[in-house]
Amino acid sequence: MGSKTSKMCCPQLRKKKRQKAHKEGPSSQELNDLNAKSQGPNELLQKIKEYEQEIRNILQKHQEEKTALADAHKADVEARTLVLQAQAQKDRDAETVKLLSEQAATMKAEMEEMFAELQKSYEQEKSSLTEIHQQLTDALQESVDELNSQLASFREKMKRVEESILSQDYQRHIQDYGSPGQFWEKELQSLHFVIEMKSELIREQDKRLQRHKSTMERSLELEERSRTLQQENEALKVQTQKQGAITVRLSEELLSIQTTLEKQTHRCEQLEREKEQNLYRAVIGDITQQFSLQELPVMVL
């Protein structure tokens, strides 16, 4: 930028030198005329000093123009540097937003996949528990039916005992010992009945105890699995709530970053416009001053 200004100023200097040389020609003629007319050298020396002062002023203005153009070039470089830095920061912010968006999408996909797997496991466990419950219900119904059948069988056996064993024993007792008294006859019948009843009850109770023991074990196992499933379901709900909170927080952070990025972008664009306006004013002012300085020596000469 400085070299261009120097090229612009050099023709002007050469023009001024030619004008000076042209003027110096007549000045030499005037000097000869003055010598011819016997005038003093003081006026000639004064004009030479004025020309030297004019040359120094031109050189000083040229140096000031070079300094102004160098400052304008420096301001332009600084403005472009700020624009590049703002663009780099904008790119970094965009990359950060993109990375956060990808992380949020990945986390959401993982959470949905985990929730789907847990939901599938929950449905399978629920189906298994429903099947087990149905099996237990069927088993209990079978037990009830079996108990009813055993009760009917027991009543039938009781009837047969009354009709067979007691009658046979009673008849044998009568044949062996004769007819007993009414009291002993009743006692004997009661004794046989109680013995048969106790034996049947003991056997039936033993069977029922075994079945109830097996049923209780299966019920306890079912309750334990139900509690485990409920705990896993609660843990799943808590984890889902945490994942939801994390997703909401990430969404809020992403929105905040996007808002900040938009503000920074708007601010960078505003700064860039201000820099361009200031640079434009500075360049226009320097050019105007340059033309003024270039015209001034001609007017003086």
Curated annotation (Swiss-Prot):
Gene Ontology MF annotations: microtubule binding
One BP annotation, GO: spindle midzone assembly
Keyword match Lipoprotein: yes
Cellular component terms per the entry's GO annotation: cytoplasm; midbody; nucleus; spindle midzone
Lipidation (N-myristoyl glycine): G2
Coiled coil regions in record: 42-167, 213-281
Disordered: annotated segments: 1-43
Residue ranges, compositional bias (Polar residues): 26-41
Transmembrane region(s): none
Predominant subcellular localization, coarse grouping: cytoplasm
Keyword Cytoplasm annotated: yes
UniProt xrefs under InterPro entries: MTUS1/CCDC69
UniProt keyword annotations, A-Z: Coiled coil, Cytoplasm, Cytoskeleton, Lipoprotein, Myristate
Localization per Swiss-Prot or TrEMBL: Cytoplasm, Cytoskeleton, Spindle; Midbody
Similarity field: Belongs to the CCDC69 family.
Function: May act as a scaffold to regulate the recruitment and assembly of spindle midzone components.
UniProt name for this protein: Coiled-coil domain-containing protein 69-B
The species this protein was found in: Xenopus laevis
Gene name tied to this protein: ccdc69-b
